[in-house]
Amino acid sequence: MSKVYNRIFTEKKWQEVNKYNKNLMEDFLLELKSQKKKKGTIDQYRNDLRILFIYILEELDNKPIHKLKKRNFRDYSLWLQDKNMSSARVNRLLSALRSMLSFAEDDDEYGEDIEINYAAKVKGLTKEKARDIHFLTMSEIMTIYNSLKAQKKYQQALLCALLIDSAGRRQEVYQVLKNAISKEANFTNEVIGKRGKKFRLFYNDLTLEAYDLYMAQRGEDDIDSLWITKHDGELKQASYESLYAWVISWRKILKDELNIDKEFNPHSFRHSSLELLNTGEHYIAKKLNKKFSLQELKVYAHHESTDTTSSYLINKDDELLLEAFGLS
């Protein structure tokens, strides 16, 4: 969650963080790199551990981490919860801490200082009940898209378009490159999905329209990624969390323009895209005058089975029963 990260982390604070703690983090990240961990995974560990060390800076007198005990890490867990982070988010931050201290325990240099991984003694939070899926109608999606265009937020309009066109996961859409979209093709560069599966994402008219607007606005730069942010006047690749924050901010558009409250997230667009293609309400389906079959959607979503694809759609059992008895 980039909003939480950006609220806690600043370069000024980071400059003040204990050098021992910084060195431990960098050595741990180098170890992850040597294990061939993905760049995105390593970046996530870095962000998670920066939150930890800024907490230590502000709440624990910037002590070197080897001087902390179990109660300190328990208090850290409580502090994270006070920031209204989800159980999954808190558990991930604690997991990053445990992994780093586990590395330190076994390391020749740090093992003398850190003989016991006290963080391992702090229990994780109980997993929260799965959230309800919030489906979006094509009309609601177009309201979001048109509002972003009107605000000249063309990059976010492109994200909205690509999510609904491709039914891609956030991690897949994040991998799309700047030069991978053109009128001559309908597929992006190759991305890596769940379980290491490689494929290209499909896009259509909405993506092409938003892409042209965005690239004209963005101009020339040497960043390969499709997604960028500007920090202190400097362009850089947007973080993975930025895409999440942008999508969450669109909830306000539906509230302001349609008086609709929906707690949707990036994955809602994957569900909604498949549902709209299945019912024929997606603009692509209307253009083709067809409803996509479950088998076609399985291929579209890069699922292993139609059972998985079916689970992404709205359950229509009640409608089928009413229709069977002539009550619909």
Region locations from a protein language model:
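Active-site/catalytic core of tyrosine-dependent DNA strand-transfer enzymes
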Residues: 204-261
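N-terminal core-binding DNA-recognition domain of tyrosine recombinases/integrases
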Residues: 8-11, 25-43, 47-131
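A short, glycine-centered helix-capping/turn motif at helix boundaries
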Residues: 108, 162-175, 280-284, 290-291, ...
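Conserved tyrosine-mediated DNA breakage-rejoining catalytic core shared by Y-recombinases
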Residues: 166, 171, 175-210
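Basic, Lys/Arg- and aromatic-enriched nucleic-acid-binding interface segment
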Residues: 138-170
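DNA breakage-rejoining catalytic core of tyrosine-based enzymes
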Residues: 125-143, 195-206, 220-224
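Catalytic-site neighborhood detector that most strongly recognizes the C-terminal catalytic loop/helix
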Residues: 195, 301-327
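Short, basic (Lys/Arg/His-rich) helix/loop patches that form interaction surfaces
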Residues: 245-299
